Curated annotation (Swiss-Prot):
GO terms for molecular function: DNA binding; histone binding. Residues 149-183 form the SAP domain. Residues 20-31, 50-65 have a biased composition (Basic and acidic residues). Residues 32-49, 245-256 have a biased composition (Acidic residues). Involved in chromatin organization. Signal peptide: none annotated. This is Protein DEK. A motif (Nuclear localization signal) lies at residues 207-223. It comes from Rattus norvegicus. Residues 281-299 have a biased composition (Low complexity). PROSITE patterns: DEK_C (PS51998).
Length: 378
């Protein structure tokens, strides 16, 4: 008892620590789980409140569409009026009126816009352009500068087409064309050139010329056959006379020559008659062909000339044949009789035989001539 009492007494004597100095009590596992559950409950309550705030009870009100209404002030167009200029109206200038009539309305829209600041309608476009007589403003004014800027935006082809309508020169750079157009439109006046000739009239004139030339050619062609017919008739008469003379010569030659050659001459006669008939037929054909063209006429003249030259030759020359063996023997005999056999060579005798018959080539019969010479000498 004494030992247990001693520590108690000692404990009573030791001072107790203050409350602030006491160590914090650590929560137990049960307390931690309870705190977590409370926090989870709080989170769930907050989520439920959010969901309730999102859910709208009843039908949703539709929003009205606010449409923008453009309150455009209606532009009041100025009434179209053609101001009187200082120059002459374009329709009164003959050449410009001619070019305006040739152009289409679409090609004149840019010119109309330049003159009146509006494209214009199809029905009144050409009329309005023709009524233009010059700009009412002066050179160097703001309106003049606006027109100059408008023209500078146009392409070269468009500026040239405007120059063509206004009867102006189309050569030069764009700046030159712009100045030329504006200077003219300030005070329009005629260029003094004559009206261009229409293509239709020129084509008609060319047709008339062709027709007139055609008639003259036809008349020449009709005259030529008459002349040719006269020439052909004279040719026929000459041919007949020649045929008759050739027949007379043949008869005389028949009387002179022996009767052996009569059959050959008769055959030649038949050939000659057939040739004369053919020549007469060809002359008639030439008459018909000569009336077709001049080229055929020239060719027919040449042919007739060649035929005439061939007809002039006697028929005996045509019918001559190379000498026979007997004739060659006789000629060789004559040559040997007159020649000195000691000096004369075979070559010289052959040459003399050839000279007696110059119209024929006797080189192939050289061997026959040599054999005859040898026979006669022996």
């Amino acid at each position: 008892m004494s030992a247990a009492a001693a520590p108690a007494a000692e404990g009573e004597d030791t001072p107790t620590p203050p409350a602030s100095e006491k160590e914090p009590e650590m929560p137990g596992p049960r307390e931690e789980s309870e705190e977590e559950e409370e926090e989870d409950d709080d989170d769930e309550d907050e989520e439920e409140e959010k969901e309730k705030s999102l859910i709208v009870e009843g039908k949703r009100e539709k929003r009205k569409v606010e449409r923008l209404t453009m309150q455009v002030s209606s532009l009041q167009r100025e009434p179209f009026t053609i101001a009187q200029g200082k120059g002459q109206k374009l329709c009164e200038i003959e050449r410009i009126h001619f070019f305006l009539s040739k152009k289409k309305t679409d090609e004149l829209r840019n010119l109309h816009k330049l003159l009146y600041n509006r494209p214009g309608t199809v029905s009144s476009l050409k009329k309005n352009v023709g009524q233009f007589s010059g700009f009412p403003f002066e050179k160097g004014s703001t309106q003049y500068k606006k027109k100059e800027e408008m023209l500078k935006k146009y392409r070269n082809a468009m500026l040239k087409s405007i120059c063509e309508v206004l009867d102006l020169e189309r050569s030069g750079v764009n700046s030159e064309l712009v100045k030329r157009i504006l200077n003219f439109l300030m005070h329009p006046k005629p260029s003094g050139k004559p009206l261009p000739k229409s293509k239709k009239s020129s084509s008609k004139g060319s047709k008339k010329e062709r027709n007139s030339s055609g008639t003259t050619r036809k008349s020449k062609q009709t005259k030529c056959p008459e002349i040719l017919s006269d020439e052909s008739s004279s040719d026929e008469d000459e041919k007949k006379n020649k045929d008759e003379s050739s027949e007379d010569e043949e008869k005389e030659s028949e009387e002179e020559q022996p009767p052996k050659k009569t059959s050959k001459k008769e055959k030649a006669k038949q050939k000659a008659t057939t040739k004369s008939k053919k020549s007469v037929k060809s002359a008639n054909v030439k008459k018909a062909d000569s009336s077709t063209t001049k080229k055929n006429q020239n060719s027919s003249k040449k042919e007739s000339g060649s035929e005439d030259s061939s007809d002039d030759e006697p028929l005996i020359k045509k019918l001559k044949k190379p000498p026979t063996d007997e004739e060659l023997k006789e000629t060789v005999k004559k040559l040997l009789a007159d020649a000195n056999l000691e000096e004369v060579t075979m070559k010289q005798i052959c040459k003399e035989v050839y000279e007696n018959y110059p119209a024929y080539d006797l080189t192939e019969r050289k061997d026959f001539i040599k054999t005859t010479v040898k026979e006669l000498i022996s």
